[in-house]
Amino acid sequence: MIQSQINRNIRLDLADAILLSKAKKDLSFAEIADGTGLAEAFVTAALLGQQALPADAARLVGAKLDLDEDAILLLQMIPLRGCIDDRIPTDPTMHRFYEMLQVYGTTLKALVHEKFGDGIISAINFKLDVKKVADPEGGERAVITLDGKYLPTKPF
């Protein structure tokens, strides 16, 4: 039976335990996701408390991280999503994304509406990918792909 969570703390505590186990075992998120049939970003989101894993994926991930049965069950429960504290993020990486939306949010909105009409880009029917590429000017660049289904607003 599908279960839902109403308290974010239990999944945040599990995320802390998962990150500790990941570090002790020197595993990457890609290594943990390998064999699940799911995207690295989706499995990572589940491990950090923002998605639910199918039972088979939860068991596979649980075995890699030496999680107990309760933790494996928690990974399958529908979490309280988007539950980062209701404030401007202070973590430097997360803050840069916040800044990007502050600067380019209205641009993204205008371009989406111009190209698609009134509606939203789904975060449910969604894919996320992060790649590291060489910068021709030296160093490295992050290529982040947000791939969401467009959902038009429907008058009623």
From Swiss-Prot:
Domain of life: Bacteria
Cited InterPro entries: Cyanase, Cyanate_lyase_C, Cyanate_lyase_C_sf, CYNS_N, Lambda_DNA-bd_dom_sf
Pfam families per record: Cyanate_lyase, CYNS_N
Enzyme Commission identifier(s): 4.2.1.104
Residue positions of the active site: 96, 99, 122
Reaction catalyzed: cyanate + hydrogencarbonate + 3 H(+) = NH4(+) + 2 CO2
GO BP terms, alphabetized: cyanate metabolic process
UniProtKB keywords: Lyase
GO molecular function: cyanate hydratase activity; DNA binding
Stated role: Catalyzes the reaction of cyanate with bicarbonate to produce ammonia and carbon dioxide.
UniProt family annotation: Belongs to the cyanase family.
Designated name of the protein: Cyanate hydratase
Biological source species: Escherichia coli O9:H4 (strain HS)
Gene, per the UniProt record: cynS
